[in-house]
Amino acid sequence: EWTIMAGMDAKTCAILASGGTPSFNPNVRDLISYQNPLVSNAFEPGSTMKTYTYMCAIEKGVYNGNEAFNSGTIEVADAVIKDWNNTGWGTITYDKGFEYSSNVGVTTMIGHFLDRDELKECFKKYGFGSHTGIDLAKESSGTLGFKYPVEVANATFGQGINTTAIQHLKALSMIANGGKELTP
């Protein structure tokens, strides 16, 4: 029951503005009221993680966006991963899969372009699962669950892991700066 908005200079990683709801209320005596959701609130990021999964394959030098996969559904262990529209778009390229936000496409990248350890290390390189170094109290590191194959599959499209808004801002800054890591 909260929202966050933030503006950042992508080249310097400087936070220009940040706000959210509920806002600080000095009359409310609970610890949550004293936390900054930009750094404290960890959440399942959903499809925003697809950007980083694709970037991991691109950075490894193995990504071929013209290769095709069958969208719709895929089985991973005992779970069925579905595209958001439940039917997919037939056989499409990985580039189209990114455009259509295909859960199946990003899931099939594991084993095809990346293995689970490479994905986890790449997510860590982008700062997920650790503190960013920002000078604000109560920063959450989030969590990266990669124990089971279905957890890895879900992580590719932002389910089953927890991240913070500041981690996403820092990761996007790294992309904008050609991989250079800056502290917000």
Map each language-model feature to its residues.
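Gly/Ser-rich catalytic serine loop of serine hydrolases
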Residues: 40-49
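Beta-lactam-recognizing serine transpeptidase/beta-lactamase-like catalytic domain environment
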Residues: 3-41, 55-184
